[in-house]
Amino acid sequence: MIVPLSHVLAVAALLFAVGGVMAAARRSILLILIGVEFMLAAAGLAFAGAGLAWNNLDGQAAVIIIMGLASAEAGLGLALLVHGRRGGGTDRADSYDRLGEES
């Protein structure tokens, strides 16, 4: 049994909204990264569902690209978090406005 496209898009929209709220409302850089990952997963779900509904492999190709983008985002974000924590800082997002300055 194939799930209807409207159901897949509704779940993707809900997942995207949860990720957007999490990324916008949180102060911790780790929780912001998790919110962005939710949003990327929602986009991948929408692409995969649309590809399945229209019998097209472009949706699966887009999911592979999104997975690569998500892994690059996670790597850069966690490197930023480790860099900030090693400098005696915190994981709060508002403390990252002065990374380039010498203090």
Swiss-Prot record:
InterPro entries from the UniProt entry: NADH_UbQ_OxRdtase_chain4L/K, NUOK/Mnh_C1-like
Gene3D superfamilies for the chain: 1.10.287.3510
Keywords noted in UniProt: Cell inner membrane, Cell membrane, Membrane, NAD, Quinone, Translocase, Transmembrane, Transmembrane helix, Transport, Ubiquinone
Gene Ontology CC terms, in alphabetical order: NADH dehydrogenase complex; plasma membrane
Membrane-related topology note: Multi-pass membrane protein
Superkingdom of origin organism: Bacteria
Region ranges (Disordered): 84-103
Places the protein is found: Cell inner membrane
GO terms for MF: NADH:ubiquinone reductase (non-electrogenic) activity; quinone binding
Record GO biological process: ATP synthesis coupled electron transport
Reaction(s) catalysed (UniProt annotation): a quinone + NADH + 5 H(+)(in) = a quinol + NAD(+) + 4 H(+)(out)
Enzyme superclass (EC): translocase
E.C. number: 7.1.1.-
Transmembrane regions listed in the UniProt entry: 1-21, 29-49, 62-82
Residue ranges with Basic and acidic residues bias: 88-103
Role of this protein: NDH-1 shuttles electrons from NADH, via FMN and iron-sulfur (Fe-S) centers, to quinones in the respiratory chain. The immediate electron acceptor for the enzyme in this species is believed to be ubiquinone. Couples the redox reaction to proton translocation (for every two electrons transferred, four hydrogen ions are translocated across the cytoplasmic membrane), and thus conserves the redox energy in a proton gradient.
Quaternary structure annotation from Swiss-Prot or TrEMBL: NDH-1 is composed of 14 different subunits. Subunits NuoA, H, J, K, L, M, N constitute the membrane sector of the complex.
Protein family according to the UniProt entry: Belongs to the complex I subunit 4L family.
Protein name as it appears in the record: NADH-quinone oxidoreductase subunit K
